[in-house]
Amino acid sequence: MTLRVRFLAEFTLSRKTRFFALLRMTCEGLGMTEREYFQVKKRTAVYPGTFDPVSNGHLDLMKRGLRIFDKLIVAVALNPTKNPLFNIEERVYFIREAVKVWKNVEVESFDNLLIDYVKEKKADVIIKGLRAVSDFEHELQMSLMNRRLDTHIETVFMMPSEEYSFLSSKVLKEVAFLKGDIRGMVPTVVVKGLKRKFKNKKIK
């Protein structure tokens, strides 16, 4: 009996019976048992960063990451050594506001070793963005260290879309401080946040 004939015959069955019939046919096509089908691991990726502040370039990578992975965790690093403009609560808030209508995205902060955080979240991939060749050397070094610490966790490098390839949080803050127009480069909530931060600051 051909697959088409089997499908037409089984389509007339009750909804519950039809579901299991189609499941059985799917599993046969994949060469696995029904138990194995439901035990296929959903992949979770962690996208870490300081995000001071989040830009549309960051959001672009998040969207593309969701095309590849079932779940994305945006991990905002506390990282006090970088002396961020926005505190950790503000940075997390900005991202949550920007992605609030998205599915399968979590946003939270972390202050421990990245590889330990990834294991805590039961993720198996780290996403890192590369704007330029100059970023690659540092990120490669970090990915090799992470692999040394845990060989089961992979790092995926992603290039930003061309329209965002020039963006960096540092440049955006400088432009905002000098009263430049950053609309279209950061989420609206960040535009408002930067205006508040620099409202009473004078250019020296």
Model-derived segments and spans:
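Nucleotidyltransferase catalytic core that binds NTPs
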Residues: 32-204
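A cross-taxon signal for low-complexity, glycine/charged-rich
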Residues: 1-11, 15-18, 23-36
